[in-house]
Amino acid sequence: MTRIIEFSGTVLTGPQTEHHGLRSVDGLLTFHRPAAAPDLVLDGWVIPGLVDAHCHIGLGPGGDVPEGVAERQAVADRDAGTLLVRDAGAVHDTRWIQQRADLPRLIRSGRH
Protein backbone atom coordinates (compact mmCIF):
# COMPACT_ATOMS: atom_id res chain seq x y z
CA MET A 1 0.00 0.00 0.00
CA THR A 2 1.34 3.42 -0.95
CA ARG A 3 1.96 5.82 1.96
CA ILE A 4 1.33 9.49 1.16
CA ILE A 5 2.32 12.37 3.43
CA GLU A 6 1.25 15.87 2.41
CA PHE A 7 3.16 18.92 3.65
CA SER A 8 0.61 21.73 3.54
CA GLY A 9 3.06 24.44 4.61
CA THR A 10 5.55 26.48 2.65
CA VAL A 11 8.58 24.79 1.08
CA LEU A 12 11.73 26.88 0.69
CA THR A 13 13.40 25.85 -2.57
CA GLY A 14 15.76 28.80 -2.95
CA PRO A 15 16.79 32.08 -1.30
CA GLN A 16 13.62 33.81 -2.50
CA THR A 17 11.63 30.88 -3.88
CA GLU A 18 8.69 29.21 -2.15
CA HIS A 19 6.47 26.34 -3.27
CA HIS A 20 3.39 24.68 -1.82
CA GLY A 21 1.97 21.21 -2.16
CA LEU A 22 4.96 18.98 -1.40
CA ARG A 23 4.15 15.31 -0.92
CA SER A 24 6.07 12.23 0.08
CA VAL A 25 4.89 9.16 -1.80
CA ASP A 26 6.53 6.06 -0.33
CA GLY A 27 9.45 8.24 0.78
CA LEU A 28 9.98 10.02 -2.56
CA LEU A 29 9.28 13.77 -2.63
CA THR A 30 7.11 15.27 -5.36
CA PHE A 31 5.07 18.39 -6.07
CA HIS A 32 2.61 16.30 -8.14
CA ARG A 33 -0.69 15.44 -6.46
CA PRO A 34 -1.31 11.66 -6.46
CA ALA A 35 -4.79 10.33 -7.15
CA ALA A 36 -5.13 8.90 -3.63
CA ALA A 37 -5.79 11.01 -0.53
CA PRO A 38 -2.87 11.56 1.86
CA ASP A 39 -2.47 9.29 4.89
CA LEU A 40 -1.09 12.20 6.90
CA VAL A 41 -1.14 16.00 6.47
CA LEU A 42 1.58 18.06 8.17
CA ASP A 43 1.55 21.85 8.46
CA GLY A 44 4.56 24.13 8.87
CA TRP A 45 7.71 25.00 6.96
CA VAL A 46 9.86 22.56 5.01
CA ILE A 47 13.56 23.44 4.79
CA PRO A 48 16.61 21.46 3.66
CA GLY A 49 18.40 19.37 6.28
CA LEU A 50 21.12 21.16 8.21
CA VAL A 51 24.85 20.32 8.30
CA ASP A 52 26.87 20.31 11.51
CA ALA A 53 30.32 21.13 10.11
CA HIS A 54 32.32 20.66 13.33
CA CYS A 55 31.18 18.21 15.94
CA HIS A 56 32.76 15.66 18.30
CA ILE A 57 30.17 12.92 18.77
CA GLY A 58 31.48 10.70 21.55
CA LEU A 59 33.22 13.47 23.49
CA GLY A 60 31.93 15.42 26.45
CA PRO A 61 33.38 18.09 28.76
CA GLY A 62 35.51 15.44 30.50
CA GLY A 63 36.61 13.62 27.33
CA ASP A 64 35.33 10.22 26.23
CA VAL A 65 31.66 9.36 26.89
CA PRO A 66 29.82 6.00 26.86
CA GLU A 67 28.16 4.84 23.62
CA GLY A 68 24.70 5.69 24.99
CA VAL A 69 25.73 9.31 25.50
CA ALA A 70 27.24 9.43 22.00
CA GLU A 71 23.93 8.11 20.65
CA ARG A 72 22.03 10.85 22.51
CA GLN A 73 24.40 13.43 20.99
CA ALA A 74 23.61 12.13 17.49
CA VAL A 75 19.87 12.05 18.26
CA ALA A 76 20.02 15.66 19.53
CA ASP A 77 21.67 16.73 16.27
CA ARG A 78 19.00 14.86 14.28
CA ASP A 79 16.15 16.31 16.31
CA ALA A 80 17.51 19.82 15.63
CA GLY A 81 17.22 19.19 11.87
CA THR A 82 20.81 18.10 11.21
CA LEU A 83 21.05 15.41 8.53
CA LEU A 84 24.83 15.49 7.97
CA VAL A 85 27.56 15.69 10.64
CA ARG A 86 31.27 16.22 10.07
CA ASP A 87 32.69 14.50 13.14
CA ALA A 88 36.05 16.16 13.81
CA GLY A 89 37.38 13.38 16.03
CA ALA A 90 36.65 11.16 18.99
CA VAL A 91 38.52 8.77 21.28
CA HIS A 92 36.48 5.72 20.29
CA ASP A 93 35.27 4.44 16.93
CA THR A 94 31.95 6.08 16.00
CA ARG A 95 31.55 4.07 12.80
CA TRP A 96 28.45 2.39 14.27
CA ILE A 97 26.60 5.71 13.90
CA GLN A 98 27.15 5.54 10.13
CA GLN A 99 25.26 2.23 10.07
CA ARG A 100 22.12 3.72 11.64
CA ALA A 101 19.57 4.98 9.10
CA ASP A 102 17.72 6.89 11.85
CA LEU A 103 20.75 9.06 12.72
CA PRO A 104 22.45 11.82 10.71
CA ARG A 105 24.95 10.78 8.05
CA LEU A 106 28.41 10.98 9.52
CA ILE A 107 31.58 12.08 7.77
CA ARG A 108 34.47 11.17 10.03
CA SER A 109 37.54 13.38 9.92
CA GLY A 110 40.34 13.87 12.38
CA ARG A 111 41.45 11.24 14.86
CA HIS A 112 39.07 8.35 15.64
Feature map (PLM): residue ranges:
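N-terminal metal-binding scaffold of metallo-dependent hydrolase/deaminase domains
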Residues: 1-35, 46
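Divalent metal-coordination and catalytic microenvironments
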Residues: 9, 27, 43, 54, ...
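Gly/Ser/Thr-rich beta-alpha loop segments that engage phosphate groups in nucleotides
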Residues: 11, 51, 60-62, 83, ...
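Flexible, glycine-rich phosphate/dinucleotide-binding loops
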Residues: 30, 38, 94
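Divalent-metal coordination cores built from histidine and acidic residues
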Residues: 67-112
